[in-house]
Amino acid sequence: MKNVTDSFVYLVGHCPFAGSFAFNTDILATNPINLSIVLGVLIFFGKGVLNDLLDNRKQRILSTIQNSEELRKKTIEQLERARDRLRKVEIEADEYRINGYSEIEREKTNLINATYDSLERLENYKNETLHFEQQRAINKVRQRVFQEALQGALGTLNSCLNSDLHFRTISANIGILGAMEEITD
């Protein structure tokens, strides 16, 4: 910075001053002077502004990095919580699945047992019905045999009995009944 100021003083001290204001058309002579003045002013005054801009930019970058780190940490925490929740949900889903399968097996077993019981009751009912029908058929056959035997016996009696035999049978029966009556008295 001191070199720029020294060169500026040197140039100002060696420039001839005219009494009036005029344009210098010598491009080679005027450009280095103008450039050195502009550069000197820019460096002198712009140094603070540039430092402020760089400091602000540095602070914004650091702030952005810190915010990004905080967001990253929060995101990692949320991810871990989500993973924990997912694990819990998977465990619950497995429990529901296992319980559901065991419930299905239990219901299946109950249904099989109920069906077996129903079939057993139907088999018993069928057997009872068959037994009842057999007894009924046997009773009908007995009744019919008895009726036919009775009719045959009555037919035989009617054909064999005459009035005299009939009268003696009745008298014998009356005598038996009379004897039974005396025994009971």
Swiss-Prot record:
Intracellular or extracellular location(s): Plastid, Chloroplast thylakoid membrane
Membrane disposition: Single-pass membrane protein
Listed name of the protein: ATP synthase subunit b, chloroplastic
Organism taxonomic ancestry: Eukaryota, Viridiplantae, Streptophyta, Embryophyta, Tracheophyta
Other facts noted in the record for this chain: In plastids the F-type ATPase is also known as CF(1)CF(0).
The keyword Chloroplast belongs to this UniProt entry's keyword annotation: yes
Organism: Dioscorea elephantipes (Elephant's foot yam)
Keyword field: ATP synthesis, CF(0), Chloroplast, Hydrogen ion transport, Ion transport, Membrane, Plastid, Thylakoid, Transmembrane, Transmembrane helix, Transport
Pfam families per UniProt: ATP-synt_B
GO cellular component: chloroplast thylakoid membrane; proton-transporting ATP synthase complex
PANTHER family, per database record: ATP SYNTHASE SUBUNIT B, CHLOROPLASTIC
Membrane-spanning intervals of the chain: 7-29
InterPro entries assigned: ATP_synth_b/b'su_bac/chlpt
Subunit (UniProt): F-type ATPases have 2 components, F(1) - the catalytic core - and F(0) - the membrane proton channel. F(1) has five subunits: alpha(3), beta(3), gamma(1), delta(1), epsilon(1). F(0) has four main subunits: a(1), b(1), b'(1) and c(10-14). The alpha and beta chains form an alternating ring which encloses part of the gamma chain. F(1) is attached to F(0) by a central stalk formed by the gamma and epsilon chains, while a peripheral stalk is formed by the delta, b and b' chains.
GO function term, MF aspect, one: proton-transporting ATP synthase activity, rotational mechanism
UniProt function note: F(1)F(0) ATP synthase produces ATP from ADP in the presence of a proton or sodium gradient. F-type ATPases consist of two structural domains, F(1) containing the extramembraneous catalytic core and F(0) containing the membrane proton channel, linked together by a central stalk and a peripheral stalk. During catalysis, ATP synthesis in the catalytic domain of F(1) is coupled via a rotary mechanism of the central stalk subunits to proton translocation.
Protein family according to the UniProt entry: Belongs to the ATPase B chain family.
